[in-house]
Amino acid sequence: MSLATETTDLVGPFRSPHNTAAEAKGSIHDDATATKLGFKGGTVAGSLHMDQFVPQLVEIYGGEWWRKGNLSLYFRQATVHGEAVRTFARRGSPHARLWMENEAGDLIMEGTASCSGSDPDSELTHRLKGQATADPGALRILAKNKVGDEAKDVALKVTRAGLEQRLKTVPEAMPEYSGDQPFLPPSMQVALFRAAQENIIKLSGRAVGLFGAIELQSINGPPRAETDYAGRFKILALSESPKTENIWYQAWAADPKTGEDVASMVMYLRFMKASSDLWN
């Protein structure tokens, strides 16, 4: 059943995103691996769905959203290649409420957006406060990590070729994604940080991971393609559930010349215990 109740809700069109990582064997995006772990098929990365919200955010906040905007989403249900979904946005203060539904009205993700700098009550800030710390010895996949671990001076960059590859399947094309200094859509902002993730997360053995939630914050944005950034990372929390081991980390991208932060990301990753030999 849809959550849309107000005539002022902004409703996007149904889009059917591509599972662009379907050929990544052994990942959650691979049909064989995903179905073995109980999913209905290889999953579409939640970061790809984030691009669908951009037209509504620009309608609510104008072009300033690219410079100071926040997008914070918690992923409720995975989708598969070609599954139709649409976005909803409800204006509000201090932030707008966002969610995504499939054609059956199932909730795919929910969260917040704002345009006044860091949001102290964003979706992920709220959820991070409720995280119970894993007991000592409870983690196996993530046993080598600890809260407060950091990585600094990490080179970050998205090439124009990488951006152009994404734009072949982006669900909502925006003029800002082209030109001499193209903006990065949310999915490619995530890719900017994720490409260097091994600098902060140390896995014991192999395990299949999936996105649990992502928050993007433009500080002096937007981040752009073909631009060098200096990255730093910090682990915020470690937790576990009967099925997963979980890690929260934050990453920042700064101008290497001035040291001024351009953008940041908070990432919540879940690693499936059933995918690890350490749990079987």
Residue ranges, per PLM feature:
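Short coil/loop residues immediately preceding or within conserved phosphate-binding loops
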Residues: 70, 95, 211-213, 248
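HotDog/MaoC-like acyl-thioester-processing domains
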Residues: 1-15, 80-145, 220-280
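Short structured motifs
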Residues: 70-75, 213-220, 235
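Hot-dog-fold acyl-thioester-processing enzymes
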Residues: 2-68, 120-215, 276-280
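Residue-level "contact hotspot" at macromolecular interaction interfaces
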Residues: 42, 72, 78-80, 222
